[in-house]
Amino acid sequence: RLDCRFEILKTFTEEWTDARHRLADLQPRGYTRIGPALRHATELLSRTDARRRLVLVLTDGKPNDYDRYEGRHGIADVRRAVLDAEARGVHIHAFAIDHDARFHLPQMFGRGRFHLLRHPRSLPRALGEAVAAMHPG
């Protein structure tokens, strides 16, 4: 695919205030090619010396693209990217608001690595839970 978009919402050096504004301004952009984005994020985070590396994915939970990146192929690609990230010390956690995502999220991200949200308003709480789980105690 010639056009795979990747957006960084917060860098390591900026304050959360700026990132919150970008998060609030997010809009759907069509197509959800999750696997390549996860591989890119994994590569970027693998270059850091951070003790913990976490990728938070906000998705409709349906990997798809115009070139048949969907169904079993898309799900398997995302699963492979998640497993590869974990092997490199990068943790992936997904958030989806679409009710139908319940069918795909467990297959792609694995048990305990996703939140299925009923409404966008519940995202801040779910984000906090996911980050807190990475920092027990």
Would you name each region that the model predicts?
Residues 1-137:
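Acidic, glycine-rich A-domain
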